């Protein structure tokens, strides 16, 4: 079988599970940013791979703000510790209020809170209506237990956004971790469905 036909037979259509944004978005978005925010909201579960300088932070904040307003509930952003305070400051510039999430606090209403990955076990995922993972490329470098903890945390949250400026689109491990967090399919399912072994001697060698 030709590989093009192999892929075609494996294809499936993802059904949008999100919502439509208002006609006017109250953020200083560039022309290329606004369609991406609208697309991510419409998808419900989406990934934004935007290179450095393309405005990943404002897009994820706009998405989080729209989810919070649409659901009337809180959205949590997971980010590396050094990025958390930067994101709060960026939000101030764009008129989007972001608070540091304190363990034990009560979260309600259309609010956006942020914490670092290491604190995730201190929060209840059922409280949140949306989740953003920033610098999501680090998922593939995390130990299995921590990566699974983040994936499991997001599974009960309806709206999910994965953001990174440094994706490795040819790294099937990264594709798998991103797809698994978004609830599309597990890494094992992805490898079984879309990758074939080339028959060589190298263990684990696979081709798309």
Predicted regions and their residues:
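Conserved helix-turn-beta segment of the N-terminal RecA-like "Helicase ATP-binding" lobe
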Residues: 82-105, 182-186
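Conserved two-lobed SF2 helicase motor
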Residues: 107-122, 163
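Conserved Walker A/P-loop ATP-binding site and its immediately adjacent core
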Residues: 57-63, 71-95, 169-175
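Conserved P-loop NTPase motor "coupling/switch" region that bridges the ATPase
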Residues: 72-74, 93, 130, 147-205
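Conserved pre-motif I regulatory segment
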Residues: 7-49
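Walker A/P-loop
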Residues: 43-63, 136
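Conserved ATPase-coupling elements of RecA-like P-loop NTPase cores
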Residues: 124-126, 136-151, 172
């Amino acid at each position: 079988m030709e590989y093009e036909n192999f892929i075609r037979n494996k294809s499936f259509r993802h059904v949008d599970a999100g919502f439509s944004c208002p006609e006017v978005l109250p953020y200083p978005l560039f022309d290329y940013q606004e369609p991406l925010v609208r697309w991510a909201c419409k998808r419900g579960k989406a990934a934004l791979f935007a290179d450095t300088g393309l405005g990943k932070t404002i897009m994820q904040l706009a998405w989080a703000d729209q989810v919070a307003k649409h659901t009337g509930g809180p959205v949590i952003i997971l980010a590396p510790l050094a990025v958390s305070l930067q994101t709060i400051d960026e939000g101030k510039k764009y008129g989007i209020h972001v608070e540091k999430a304190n363990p034990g606090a009560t979260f309600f209403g259309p609010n956006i809170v942020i914490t670092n990955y290491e604190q995730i076990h201190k929060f209840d995922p059922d409280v949140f209506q949306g989740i953003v993972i920033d610098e999501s490329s680090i998922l593939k470098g995390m130990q299995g237990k921590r990566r699974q903890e983040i994936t499991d945390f997001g599974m009960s949250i309806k709206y999910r956004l994965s953001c990174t400026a440094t994706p490795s689109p040819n790294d099937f491990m990264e594709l798998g971790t991103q797809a698994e967090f978004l609830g599309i399919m597990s890494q094992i399912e992805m490898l079984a469905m879309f990758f074939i072994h080339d028959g060589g001697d190298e263990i684990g060698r696979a081709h798309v």
